[in-house]
């Protein structure tokens, strides 16, 4: 699994990862130091990054996602409300 680092962004008031470019499906695991929220934004064909709907994205310390890449390339960015302990992903 590959590690992803997040830095605090005062404008977003959140911990933010760099934009990840994905070429195929991944398994994503996010573990927070304290309970918090997660938001994932995914690129669209216009260069915008709208939110990806997530059912249970609040008041949890550990999140696991399977992200399917339908077009050739997808870019995502991850935002967390509390400091992440680890963010990892693996191609599947």
Where are these regions (language model features)?
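Short, surface-exposed beta-strand/strand-loop-strand elements in extracellular ectodomains
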Residues: 35-48
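Exposed low-complexity, polar/acidic, P/S/T/G-rich flexible segments that act as propeptides
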Residues: 40, 82-92
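Extra-cytoplasmic beta-strand recognition segments
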Residues: 18-34
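Short beta-strands within extracellular/lumenal beta-sheet-rich domains
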Residues: 8-21, 60-63
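Acidic surface patches and DE-rich sequence motifs
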Residues: 9, 44, 57, 80
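Noncatalytic modules at the cell exterior or secretory-pathway interfaces
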Residues: 24-28, 67-82
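Extracellular carbohydrate recognition and processing domains
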Residues: 48-70
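Short carbohydrate-recognition loop motifs
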Residues: 1-9
């Amino acid at each position: 699994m590959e590690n992803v680092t997040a830095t605090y962004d005062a404008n977003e008031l959140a911990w933010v990862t760099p934009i990840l470019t994905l070429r195929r499906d991944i398994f994503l695991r996010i573990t927070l130091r304290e309970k918090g929220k997660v938001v994932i934004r995914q690129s669209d064909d216009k260069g915008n990054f709208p939110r990806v709907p997530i059912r249970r994205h609040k008041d949890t310390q550990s999140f696991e996602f399977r992200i399917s890449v339908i077009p050739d390339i997808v870019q995502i960015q991850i935002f967390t409300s509390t400091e992440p302990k680890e963010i990892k992903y693996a191609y599947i």
